[in-house]
Each structure stands twice: as C-alpha cells, then as structure tokens.
Swiss-Prot record:
Activity modulation comment: Autoinhibited by the C-terminal PH domain which folds back and binds to the surface of the DH domain, blocking binding of RHOA to the catalytic center of the DH domain. The 2nd BRCT domain is also involved in inhibition, probably by helping to impede RHOA binding. Allosterically activated by binding of activated GTP-bound RHOA to the PH domain which stimulates the release of PH inhibition and promotes the binding of substrate RHOA to the catalytic center. Binding of phosphorylated RACGAP1 to the N-terminal BRCT domain-containing region also releases autoinhibition.
Acetylation among keywords: yes
Entry's Gene Ontology cellular component terms: bicellular tight junction; cell-cell junction; centralspindlin complex; cleavage furrow; cytoplasm; cytosol; midbody; mitotic spindle
UniProt feature, compositional bias: Low complexity: 856-870
Any coiled-coil regions, as ranges: none
Modified residues (Phosphothreonine): T359, T373, T444, T846
Top-rank taxon: Eukaryota
Primary location group: nucleus
Protein name per UniProt: Protein ECT2
Upregulation: Up-regulated by phenobarbital in the nucleus and cytoplasm of the liver.
Amino acid sequence: MADDSVLPSPSEITSLADSSVFDSKVAEMSKENLCLASTSNVDEEMPQVEARVIMVQDAGKQEELLKALKTIKIMEVPVIKIKESCPGKSEEKLIKSIINMEMKVPCVKMDSMEEFESLDSPEFENIFVVTDFQNSVFNDLYKADCRIVGPPVILNCAQRGEPLPFSCRPLYCTSMLNLVLCFTGFRKKEELVKLVTLVHHMGGVIRKECNSKVTHLVANCTQGEKFRVAVSLGTPIMKPEWIYKAWERRNEQCFCAAVDDFRNEFKVPPFQDCILSFLGFSDEEKHSMEEMTEMQGGSYLPVGDERCTHLIVEENTVKDLPFEPSKKLFVVKQEWFWGSIQMDARAGETMYLYEKANTPELKKSVSLLSLSTPNSNRKRRRLKETLAQLSRETDLSPFPPRKRPSAEHSLSIGSLLDISNTPESSIHYGETPKSCAKSSRSSTPVPPKQSARWQVAKELYQTESNYVNILATIIQLFQVPLEEEGQRGGPILAPEEIKTIFGSIPDIFDVHMKIKDDLEDLIANWDESRSIGDIFLKYAKDLVKTYPPFVNFFEMSKEMIIKCEKQKPRFHAFLKINQAKPECGRQSLVELLIRPVQRLPSVALLLNDLKKHTADENPDKSTLEKAIGSLKEVMTHINEDKRKTEAQKQIFDVVYEVDGCPANLLSSHRSLVQRVETVSLGEHPCDRGEQVTLFLFNDCLEIARKRHKVIGTFRSPHDRTRPPASLKHIHLMPLSQIKKVLDIRETEDCHNAFALLVRPPTEQANVLLSFQMTSEELPKESWLKMLCRHVANTICKADAENLMYVADPESFEVNTKDMDSTLSRASRAIKKTSKKVTRAFSFSKTPKRALRMALSSSHSSEGRSPPSSGKLAVSRLSSTSSLAGIPSPSLVSLPSFFERRSHTLSRSTTHLI
C-alpha cells in the first residue's frame, strides 16, 4: 500500500501524519513540485509511537467488538519523511508511505469528549471506533482530524485476519471499497454532498470526470457528456437510491454494493425520462413495444403529442412522416429502441436518426446486390452488376417471403419450405467464420450443351452454398456475439442457454463447408464422369455424428429461445436487431435454425433426381445409390435417437414431478411404459384413500402419492422453469419382486380393483398392495396384462398369464365402498391425524388362508391357466397341505419395510442402475 510523493520542505524530519493533515498536505502538492522518490529508507528511523484503539461510548459496551479487537494485532499507519532531493540543492522532498504497526497497547474506552484531551497524546497513533456517524461526538472527533472507523471495519478485519486500514476520511464500512464513482445531473448541492459523504464512509472514491477508471456513474438524468461517455465505455449507470440502500445495509458483514444481485435493482433503465411514440408498426408489435417501454422505465403517448421526446419509426413501412417534427423530438429508427434495451442503456440518437429514402426501389436492389456479389474495387464492374441486378425480375434472396408475426408462434418442423426450393444463385454475406463466404469462382465454365445432370448438379451446389451461408449467418450474427466476453450490460444469455439453443451448429457448418468446397471444385471442373456420390459418401460419418444431436433437440432449442425471449428483454432486443438485418432476410432465429432439420431430406431428393439423369453406364450411378442409402441411414439414426431422447425426457419428467424420486431411476436402458392413477385400498403402500400414481417402466414400478402440500418457494415466478413437484415418492420396486398380480372380481362393493403380491428381498414375508383404478382411459384388463407381460420379461418367463390370479374381494378383504363419501374422507383424516400424533402405525393383516392359497397357486400351477371360480374350493383345500412348510405370509413385518418408503434410495432398488 505504499504511495510515494515529494514536496519541498525546509528541513529533514520524520514524523507520523494525522489522516486529515496528511490528506490536506497531499492535496496541496502542485504538479510542478511532484516527483517520485524511493521509500527504501522509510524504516531507517521509526518514531517512538504506540498504536492504540479507543472505543467511543456504545462501542465499548459491545462484547462482539471487544472480542474481535483481541484478534487484531496490526494497524496501518501513515508515515512522512522529509529529506534533501539532490546533493548541492536546497530543495527538499517529502515522502509519504503506509506502514504496518503492531498494536501493543490494549484498547481504551471513552464515554465523552471531556476525556479526549487526556487521550489525545503525540505518543499514540489513535483510531476511534464510533457506532453512530451522526451524533455530536463523531462531529467533534471529525473536526479534530481524528481517525474514525465504524464497527463493521473492526469485525471484517478480525474475520479476514487483516490489519486495521488507514483512511484519510472516516470509514464506517468497506461495502464500496475499490469503487470509483462519478456524479452527473444533480442540481442541489446539499443532496450531492450527502451522497459523496456516504460514499466516503463506505470506502468509495469520487472522481470529477468520467473516464475509464470510473467503475460506476451515479446519474440523476439521462443526458449530458458524462452519461454519453459512460454508455460508450459500458460503465454501469446507477440511481442515487443505490447509495442510500447500500448505506442502510452498512452493518452487514461481507456485504458489497457492487454485486450484481444488489446493483442491478438500481441501474438507470434505458428509457428513463423518455416519452416514446411509435409509427408504422402493426397493432401487435406496437402493443409489445409499449409494454417493453414501461418495463424499461419509460412511458408512451400517441404519435404527434408535443410531450413526446422520441418518435420510433418502422423505416421499412413509413415513407413520409405525417407531421413536421419539432427540434426537440428525436425521430429514430426502431434499431435505436432495441439497441438501447440490448445494451441496457439509452443509446445515442445521432447514430439512428430516421432519414427519408428518396429512391427506395434502387436502394433495395443495391442492398440485395451487395449481399450476392463478391467485394470488388472496380467501379465499372459494380455499375454493370447493379444495372444487371435492376433488370432481373427474380428476387435473389434465399429466404421465402416474410410470414406474418403471428405465424412465428405456430412454427413447426414441417411448416417451412426448404431453402433449396427458392434460391437461384449463390448468396454471400461478407466475412463468415473460417472465411466460409469467400467469393465463389466468378465464372463457372459452362459446357457447350448443358445436360440435365449438369443442371441438377448446379442446383445442388447452389442450394449447398446458400445453406452454408445460412449457417454462417446463424453463427456470425447470433452465436458469436452471444458468446463474446465483456458484453455491455453483462452477458445476455448464460453459457448453458447458448449451448441449448445452438447445439452442434458449428460442427454441421464445418461439414457442409467441406461438401460445398468439393461441389464447387466439381462444378468448376465439370465432367460427366466425375462422381457426386463420392462427396457425400466421404462425409457420411460426419453427418451421422453432427446431425442427430441438433435435430433431436430442436424442439428444446426452440422452447429455450421462446422462454429466454419472454424472460430476458435484452435477448428479445438482440433478436429484433438481427432480424431486421438483410442477412437474415427478416426471418427469426427459430426460422433460421429449422434449416438443418430440412436439409438432409432435401439433399436426398436432389440426389434421387441426379440419379435419374445419370446414365446406367456412368460409374456415379451406383455411387449415388450408396450416397442416398447413407443419407437414409443418417435420417433413420436421427429418428431412433429421437425416440430414445423422447423416452429419456419422459423419465426426466417423472423425476421432476415426483419429489424425492430415486436418482437411480435414470438409466439408459429404462423407458416409461404406462402411467396409472389409482387410490390405495389398504394401509399400504400408504393410507387407505390416498391418491397413488403408478409409473410402470420396463423393469420397475415407481409408486408415488399425491402431495398434501406443495413445496413453497421464494423464487420469482419468472425464474421458475417448471412447476413444483405434485407427487411424493413412496417406493421404487423392481418388477422381479412382484410374485402375483391379483385381478379382483367386480361386485357391488368392489369396482376396478386389483392387488399386487410383493416379496421384497430384505423381508421374509409377503406384502399385499391393493388399489382401485381411477383413470378411465385404460381398461383394467389391459393394464393388468401389460403389467404381467413386463414382469414376465423381467424374470425371463414366457408364461405371463400364470402371473395373474382372479380372486374374490372378500378373500383379501378388499372393497371400494364409500371411498368418495364425506364420512369416509373425514374418517381417513382423523385416522391420519391420530397416526401423526401417536407416531404409531397399525397394520391390518391379510387373511393367511387366502394368501396361502395364492402363493400355493404360484408354485403349483406352473404352465397352467389360473383356476376357475368353480374349482376355487378344491384349490383351497389342496393348497393348504402344500403350504405347511412355508412361513406365514402375514404382514406383521410390514412396518420395517414401509416405514422406509420416504427414503430416496433403498437396498431393494440399488441394483436397478
């Protein structure tokens, strides 16, 4: 912390400088006398002074402060040393520096200013700890040029193990340490003095001029030179409330006023003090922009109102203004509106002033030409191409006609024409990544007689060139700017959001750049015998590698764009600015990103057309067939991956919906088969009457109940990406644990009921789980057959029918009577409350005789169909003796199993991974 400077002085002395005296001397030094000097000799002669802390009034009564002071051993002290500058000259230099001095003297308490004279001694370097910077004692100490700090400084130094800092001004806390502030737009001197004082008390520094060293500009208006400089430098522009709110939090340890979460709340919005009006926009666009104006701190009025400060004009539709604007009114293009939102500050109007176009037709044609021709410095050639462009009737744009804004929201994969159906020539957009848009060969040798094969090959090259330029536009105008560091106003999107939106677009671009170059060489050196199929066979593996990740997640990419556009105004403005550029053809990012989805089918059609116009004796005939086959394999691979992706997405949806769902549910080999809504009929897996959802997977069954109370959250609704979990995890059961599926007969007291006979590996008894189906979409018979089939597949048995057993409800004491009655619901509520109070669980036993009969059936009826009702009595008698050596299937041991149902992982499910 050494800071050296010099000042003429009459003699060479060494002394300790009081903070205010030290600061005043430094301020009085002129630039003519100021030069640097070494401080290597500062420690040669140290003064005989002790460092001491004085606790003023309430500070001496706070035990936390006194305890913190015991851990602080060092204090920063200013030192001034005066010596001759050069031999033989009378001038002398004053050197200042900061040294660390050990605190050997214990702290002293001071209750009033009457004690100050006895404590103010030149033998001590005193630092006063004051809890209130507004009382009279503070003012008296400040007038006496004393070093003053607040309690937060002591606590922070003790926590971090740092010495007590030196400050030439009273320092209450360090929440604005290392911040350099500048002020603009304040007319009342009293308000400005108050703000400056608070900044100094929090450790901040004030600068008169706004330059690159200023970290924050505190503005009371959105005009002036300082404001424009801050905007150009990307300096955060803050409201005065930022300082006041930071001062309110002065006693919070480790609080920093510059953190984004706190600072962003007080940034000056782009349209503060602005009154906008909009001309030439559709009603939908105008309404959206008016809402955005209010969100960004501005207001709006009808066109022509004298109070308006800005008129936003849609330059593509407005040919003339309906009135003569006043000199105070800024008439700007819509790019100013979106640019201000994107940079999170009011942009300079001079760069976006609206100008009436005298010859819009010519201007449009020239702009189109500038996109489609190589850069050239020859005026004659440019003029010739311009005239040729004006004489053409076809539009050179590779994009289809602009859709209505409302159509963008209903965009789907099959809703747009492929790019290959529209272009007539190759279009270049200037510099692109890796020089992708380098000019094509200006003259392509045309055969004397253009064959049909050559025409199709040329069309294939032209569409490939246009497609590469579309990919280059996506990367150059959208992805690269979003990924750039040091964006004005901070990053527009998070890195994971950018990755989700663009995915493997750069990889797809690299592959098609190579294909385009090979096709360009083939067209430039055309020969009927040259193979086009070899080009696509050459890059078939690359296409398989790059396309599935993007196509499979296109819908997710589209959803991410829509979500971010709604939640992040800067991203919405960013898209609007780029969409208006000619490179995009006035198409949205979603419309551009659908091109890779459409490209491979389009190429396959062109290759088929090329094969039709290729002679049988041409070697390329068979090569084209292989190339078409390779493209079909890529598309098949995409479809298979998409199905897998959708299956995995379904599992993720279950994990998000079920609170406490086991992590081992996520597995690459697992897929969701069926979801069934039921009601529990027994005491297990949860209380009778509870709504239970069964998720059947190909190898396990997830059991979850409806949450009684949804988890609350303190997060903003705008930040929530998905609804809270509506279900609570009970148990994840491998299908191998299901020994029997019981189809309960339909009676007056029992409807749509079924049960599962389960044998957990950690238990020595069987468990009966009974349910009533509540969903009408899936018949009970279909559900039970589906369940039995997957259980049989899991245990590697072919006879799935033998897993099902038809039973009477009385045999297992199962009934659905009065499940929805008011009395039944009240009884269940009382029972549940009683369980919570007593912390006890009561388990009703399933009749042993019925369970013995069911278990005997599973052992003795291998390879036979379930017994009919007529033979049920005989079956019961014959099965009794066979169960003599089998432990009783009583549910006495159920508590040890189902009391663990709320655990996320259990020993019975860990092998599912």
